[in-house]
A protein has these predicted regions:
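A residue-level signal for conserved active-site and pocket-lining positions in enzyme catalytic cores
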Residues: 45, 79-80, 142, 170, ...
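Conserved cytochrome P450 K-helix E-x-x-R motif and the immediately C-terminal K′/meander segment
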Residues: 126, 160-192
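Conserved active-site beta-strand-loop modules that form the wall/rim of enzyme catalytic pockets
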Residues: 135-137, 142-153, 179-180, 185-196
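Active-site substrate-recognition loop segments, prototypically the cytochrome P450 B′-helix/B-C loop
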Residues: 1-73, 84-89
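Cytochrome P450 heme-binding Cys-pocket and its upstream "meander" loop
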Residues: 190-216
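Cytochrome P450 catalytic-core helices
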Residues: 134-135, 142-164, 206-224
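Cytochrome P450 catalytic core segment centered on helix I
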Residues: 80-140
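Long, low-complexity intrinsically disordered regions
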Residues: 20, 28, 131-133, 137, ...
Length: 224
């Protein structure tokens, strides 16, 4: 049964911010948008995701090429590198990881994250607009969540279990994202996502299929 709180608005983030930094990213991505802005910004993300194809195969190839790297590095770089290539960007995984650590409103920003944001905006064409925010936000959203999902899958793997079945089980039993935050009657409320790991309602993750394909491609290599 869906939790009606999942459809409530997210906690507000400051809107009057200087363009180009982490706070600007928060103020312009669908993830933290006000209801009146959310549908438009989510559509920008969907437009970037729609042309992507063969992500499982591409993640497989990149993971195979990186097989001698530490697993933790593979998990942190391959998802971002695959999606960045689909967006026509170079491997920006290092900068995305830096921004990801400061992305959520309850975390602190810092000079490293601000510098990374400037490089990412420049890599996206230099315009600090909603499309650029959508592209960077897409990669940030993929960074930690996909790494955690694949990491949990590697820990939980049972002999003979294939990537698809393993991921389905992990999402049921030990999802990487267990709670989200919503704004109810002027207060922040945590909403349980255990039974809906990709969210619910209008804020459901638009990249679920893409994340699963990338995760499967990585596991196809690492489980061998």
């Amino acid at each position: 049964m869906e939790n009606p709180l999942a459809e409530a608005p997210v906690p507000p983030v400051p809107q009057d911010v200087e363009p180009g930094g982490v706070r600007w990213l928060r103020a312009n991505v669908a993830r933290f948008s006000r209801p009146e802005d959310h549908a438009r910004r989510r559509a920008l993300v969907v437009a970037e995701l729609t042309p992507m194809s063969a992500l499982r195969e591409k993640a497989f190839e990149l993971t195979r090429e990186s097989r001698d790297e530490p697993v933790e590095r593979i998990l942190r770089t391959v998802p971002v590198a695959v999606l960045a290539a689909e967006l026509g960007l170079p491997d920006v995984s290092r900068d995305i990881a830096t921004v990801s650590a400061a992305y959520h409103p309850h975390t602190e920003t810092g000079p490293d994250a601000e510098k990374a944001m400037r490089r990412l905006i420049e890599g996206c064409g230099g315009d600090a607009d909603e499309r650029t925010a959508a592209r960077i936000g897409l990669l940030v959203q993929a960074c930690d969540a996909t790494a955690k999902l694949v990491g949990k899958a590697l820990e939980a793997h049972r002999p003979g279990e294939d990537a698809a079945g393993l991921l389905d089980r992990v999402l049921r039993e030990d999802p990487p994202v267990r709670v989200t935050r919503r704004w109810i009657n002027g207060a922040v409320v945590e909403v349980d996502l255990t039974e809906r790991p990709f969210g619910a309602g209008p804020k459901r993750c638009p990249g679920q299929a893409h994340a699963m394909d990338v995760a499967k491609g990585i596991l196809d290599v690492l489980l061998c």
